[in-house]
Design a protein with these regions (language model features):
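Anionic-ligand binding patches
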Residues: 7-16, 23-198
Length: 198
């Protein structure tokens, strides 16, 4: 997929998605396409701040980038929150994945009975008229070992509720039935499409 790619069927419904992660774009691309919405991928790094909550991080990033591109856009950030670790790594998920990796998280949970966790995505939509946040959450548990070769990030160790497979063992379509990212984007779409009808 190129740095700027579109999907969907209605040329009047096009949204700029800011991310340097192609996997995230692919997930949202599939959801948008199924709703007849066009997504344009702006492949640039986010302007991030160190903060203790995802809402503050994405709001800052979205506003900062909007001031440059001056087009309606979405910025998203996601975190893995492990209950036995008091919500760690949370908003520091990307940093922890790079430093500890999947094995590092599994070692932290070695011998821990409570493996419950959740993924949370927060999306910020910015236009010349508004700034809105949309959230998606999926509950589940951390697996005992790394499983699956699909997906990205912590997908190989996260099993959503009512499933036995990790996200990394699912296709994008299967993952989107549970995905925190898909839920957040659908929440945005419901708002966006209802606003266009008024």
């Amino acid at each position: 997929m190129s740095k700027r790619e579109e999907g969907g069927v209605n040329s009047n419904d096009k949204i700029l998605l800011v991310t340097s992660n192609e996997n995230k774009f692919r997930e949202i691309f599939e959801v948008a396409k199924s709703h007849g919405i066009k997504i344009e991928w702006l492949n640039i790094p986010k302007f991030e701040i160190q903060a203790d909550n995802l809402e503050e991080i994405v709001r800052y990033s979205a506003i900062t980038i909007y001031q440059v591109v001056r087009k309606p856009l979405i910025v998203e950030d996601s975190g893995l929150f492990i209950n036995a670790l008091n919500g760690f790594p949370g908003p520091y998920t990307n940093y922890v994945r790079r430093k500890l990796g999947l094995e590092g998280i599994l070692k932290l949970l070695n011998g821990v009975e409570d493996r419950s966790a959740y993924f949370k995505t927060v999306m910020c939509y910015v236009s010349d008229k508004e700034i809105n946040l949309f959230t998606g959450v999926v509950t589940g548990r951390i697996s005992e070992r790394i499983k699956g070769e699909k997906g990205f990030g912590f997908d190989p160790i996260f099993i959503p509720e009512n499933e036995e497979r990790t996200f990394a063992e699912m296709s994008t379509e299967e993952k989107n039935k549970y995905s925190h990212r898909a839920k957040a984007f659908i929440s945005f779409l419901n708002y966006y499409l209802s606003e266009r009808k008024t």
